[in-house]
């Protein structure tokens, strides 16, 4: 970056250019921070209150590991593959959100925006400001839908996005999805 003093007088950027850059950086950081906080809130809610079934049983995972151990591959590769297969039995946030989608509590499109945004925001990937606004609104809508279902609210509510306000219907959380 070139400093204003190093540029000839007739080519120096104006003070307003620098202030505009600063304002843009602050606004982008603000939107990113809000989106990340909302995304983490979704993760906390589903981790603490929602349960889902593992994709594979312990027996299936054990069988997969046995097959992997029979491979003629370096020990490091076999170990890595066994760890990846073990993770198939883990019930993570995405699996819990999928259970909520399947129950009609949350919208699959918002979960997709949340998932993409959460990874980008948590790992410091740059994005356009409007993407962070979309991520924030999707995460807030997920929070509202999850909280309303946890409260066993059965009725209308409004979700907001950059496209506008949408009428939606909340349904109570099925008992089999509620952590005891």
Where are these regions (language model features)?
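Amphipathic, oligomerization/interface secondary-structure segments
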Residues: 1-180
